[in-house]
Amino acid sequence: KEDCPRLVIASLLSEHESLDTIMHMIVAQNIGWDLTYIGNGVPHDEITFAASKVKAQVVVLAINNPRDIARKIYEIKHIRDKAHKTEDIILIGSQSNDYKQLSNDFNINISNDLTSFRLSLERLYSLIR
């Protein structure tokens, strides 16, 4: 899909996979995004590398584990710092609300449910196209 906007979806280290992440992937594909799924428990530098390699406009991070918040904040900041200015970051998952302050400080989107995720992707899709 050369003409479609691209996104990368992954979970940070110490994260587990959930059905929620798979449902978000289905929503993204149904809207028309070209999706690259990296997996769960992925180091932040590999997520950054993959996003640049596929020229992703959006990086989606699934956060479902309440542990290691300080490390995850560091990793999300690193991804934000290394991301191109055209890349948006969206946090999804059951624990994403714990990162509201990070969202405000670093212009990172948080989607609490599938509907808000779909609306965020549709808005970004219209801006990219």
Would you name each region that the model predicts?
Residues 31, 85, 103-107:
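Short, structured coil segments at secondary-structure junctions
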Residues 87-94:
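Short beta-strand elements of ligand-binding domains
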